Amino acid sequence: MSTPSTTRNDRWPPQIKFIVGNEACERFSYYGMKGILAGYMTGAILKGGLNMSDDRATTIFHLFVFANYFTPLIGAWLSDRLFGRYGTILWVSLFYCAGHGVLAMNDLFTSVDAKFNLLCVGLTLIAFGAGGIKPCVSAFMGDQFKPDQGHLMQKAYGAFYFSINFGSFFSFIVIPRLREAYGYGWAFGVPGILMAIATIIFWVGRKHYQRVEPTGDPDWLKKVMWMVGCVLGGIGIWYLKTKTSISGFWLSGSLGGLGILALAIFTVRLHRRVDTRKEKLDSSAYVVWWYGLTSPIMGKTGSLWDAASQRFTPKSLDHGISTGRILTIFALIPVFWALFDQSNSTWVLQGNKMVPLQLTGFWKSAFGWFFGDAINAENMQSTNPALVMILVPFLTLGVYQWFGRYVTPLRRMGCGMFIAAFSYVIVAWLQQRIEAGEQISVAWQALPYVFLTTGEVLISATGLEFAFTQAAPEMKSTIMSFWLLTVAAGNALVSIITSVLSSDAAGHSGAVSSGRFMLYAGMTAIVGVLFVLIAMRYRYRDTAPAAQLAAR
């Protein structure tokens, strides 16, 4: 009997077009709203804005982005345990649409307080919607490919990534133009319409999708109640902090201490209760790293991994070792995201103090329909996705191929840190000129955008590659969730720094100042040095059997 030959199916799954179309429209809606958000919060009341200070607007903006990258944990749980990926994407998208709708209602009110309340409700719904579907969409696309179509996945994800930048590029061009012509109501409303279209496109393909059923969770109600309790507790703490004379410093410190204590108790209880020598590998595998750290405190001697090896299987120990090393690298990444996401906040606020680039002659004929008579700070944000679409193939197919094995993932990421830091040196120099009273063109911002975007490609794209190749097979989804948390942590860092170094405090400049930009540049350079030192000691994961790894 002849052995059947392995065949390849070169036909794309027909449902992929619905997923890619959904992603392009969703990204247009998200970045279109995000691109005008800083200007809306700081804009004059007569022009429909909220007239906030730069510091307050920066804090709110980055808390919103933080929520966008923290809520994927909720979306992943809903997807894996209750609704499945299709159900989660569809139903959570409705909250997303509602958030845009709430923001679009701002023109119906004249009271600044009413508009601010709408802003809070709208951003909360959008954060839950955008974050909730984030871990589901790309994984759902992977579910559509059969084993004989695996060779098509790289091209499909390339189209997926291109759709993200395609949607964001045009949103930074079109939405500011709508804002100038029709006000913030339509500028927030059109992204909502695009999100509704994205949801409809996704729903239309429902009969073609391959769906992975959720595993279920018998304790889901307890977990939901616990989460609701946390939210209500947070609201209560916020009320106490704002309505009483309790020092915010001591309140935050006490809450932080209680959080650390709760985490320590949870870790001790977990590693006493779980024994992976008797149980199948589950989510307890990645806490082996914590176990190795806490065992010496509890009186055990020997190396950290010797202590862990007394309780965990070689396979679990291997997962703990690889996860611990990856998390050590990830711990330094948030500072980059603190820089990168300010391109939509403080950079826009800086650009609003610069002179718009007037379009004349050929340039007006070619680009006047997109930009109008001039390119402003909000339009300049389109520089980033445009550069990404150029730099990714240039670096991947050119630079990386040329230097070969010398361009390791960690070397790329370390280089990206210093390049991103240098972009803020340029931004600080531009801000010094503005503070000196010079009238400079917003076109100057293209220069730091080149360096910041290069840093993004070197760190973001490479970081995903590094995490995927270095994580144990069963831990890849967990590691990807930690990667998203680095973005959340970076934006939380900006909010904290802006609050602590508020311009209202004596001796501190505002969020948009040369001193603040240099602070971020110096901080990133220092972290870059630490990153290089740690990367030099990093041992890349090899293919040694788990039994050999356990003997280390």
List each language-model region with its residue ranges.
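A gly/Pro-rich, aromatic-decorated transmembrane alpha-helix motif that marks the paired
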Residues: 34-35, 70-77, 105, 165-181, ...
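Intracellular juxtamembrane helix-capping segments at the cytosolic ends
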Residues: 132-148, 457-471
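Conserved MFS/SLC helix-loop-helix module at the cytosolic interface between two early adjacent transmembrane helices
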Residues: 72-95, 101
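Central cavity-lining transmembrane alpha-helices of secondary-active solute carriers
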Residues: 59-80, 169, 382-395, 489
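Loop-to-transmembrane helix entry
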Residues: 47-66, 152-158, 247-254, 323, ...
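Hydrophobic core of transmembrane alpha-helices in multi-pass small-molecule transporters
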Residues: 24, 98-99, 112-133, 430, ...
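Intracellular loop-helix junctions on the cytosolic face of multi-pass helical membrane proteins
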Residues: 1-18, 147-148, 154, 176-373, ...
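C-terminal ends and interior cores of transmembrane alpha-helices
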Residues: 92-114, 418-437
